[in-house]
Amino acid sequence: MRFFRKQWSNLISLSDNQIGLALLALLAGIASALVITLFRLAIELPLVAFLPIDSPESYEELGQWARIALLGGGSLILILLFHSLPRERRGVGVSHVLQRMEMHQGYLPLPNIVVQWFAAAVAIVSGHSVGREGPAIHLGAGTASQIGQSVGLAHHRLRILAGAGVASAISASFNTPMA
């Protein structure tokens, strides 16, 4: 296994090797799409299973007190989550991705990706005015970045791979075949 990883690292580290980068981008795109599909299921399944609504988008069918309780409970969970995290782990969303792309060459840390997943799922399920597209961008870029980091991809190629992850995540988020 170590030999294969060394050979793969040598293959993709060459600046003129576009085939290795294309294969890695394909893998990152598939992984990002799977992550976003699981994220959407993590949002839609609890809504349909536990709330008396017909569609995951129809919070107006809930009573006034149910909406208030749902929002309050979700807010409390999010406050406790972000208050307990160190400052460097609180970065989530599109602005975090842009900052990491600009100042850290596409290195997106895994803990921030996990926080994004959990916080966005709680916010959306509890009825906050949060869309799934912003978290999808972070989750897609983060998934691709983690794949690139695991194979030792160079900075300039890691940024390209993170962009491929974003495109795949947006495509999966909107149920479109290609971004």
Explain the meaning of each model-derived region.
Residues M1-A179:
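Alpha-helical transmembrane segments and immediately membrane-proximal extracytoplasmic
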